[in-house]
Swiss-Prot record:
Keywords noted in UniProt: DNA-directed RNA polymerase, Nucleotidyltransferase, Transcription, Transferase
SMART domains according to UniProt: RNA_pol_Rpb6
Classification via Gene3D superfamilies: 3.90.940.10
GO molecular function: DNA binding; DNA-directed RNA polymerase activity
Full protein name: DNA-directed RNA polymerase subunit omega
Subunit structure: The RNAP catalytic core consists of 2 alpha, 1 beta, 1 beta' and 1 omega subunit. When a sigma factor is associated with the core the holoenzyme is formed, which can initiate transcription.
Bias kind Acidic residues: ranges: 103-121
Originating species: Magnetococcus marinus (strain ATCC BAA-1437 / JCM 17883 / MC-1)
Documented EC number(s): 2.7.7.6
The keyword NAD is assigned to this record: no
Transferase recorded as keyword: yes
Described function: Promotes RNA polymerase assembly. Latches the N- and C-terminal regions of the beta' subunit thereby facilitating its interaction with the beta and alpha subunits.
Record's catalysed reaction(s): RNA(n) + a ribonucleoside 5'-triphosphate = RNA(n+1) + diphosphate
Disulfide bonds: none
Amino acid sequence: MARVTVDDCVQHVSNRFELVILAAKRARQLAKGAEPEVSVDRDKNTVVALREIAESKLNMDDLRRMEETVVEEEVVDEVIRFEIADLAVSDDLADGDAANDLQGEEDDLGLGLDEAEDLGF
């Protein structure tokens, strides 16, 4: 197939927006080393992905499920990043409280910060 048109692909994926998403997903897979289902020649991954769709070489349901799995993994990663950031803030606040306690002890004793630390405060 020398040229791929949207009309060739829309016969297999009726929604043009979904077509773009699925073709992009497949192009990413190809970029990561997935084996192409059509001859590559010198075509870019996006063209190869569209040719695979137009020639019915891919299972669209499998490609859709892969997309859902990636989205779920991204959500989990985001939650983990949020939790880590939240813990870091909590630790910073706890460290700030300890510094304030140390400052209070230093004031009570009339010592400087370095002197208070040397004494174990």
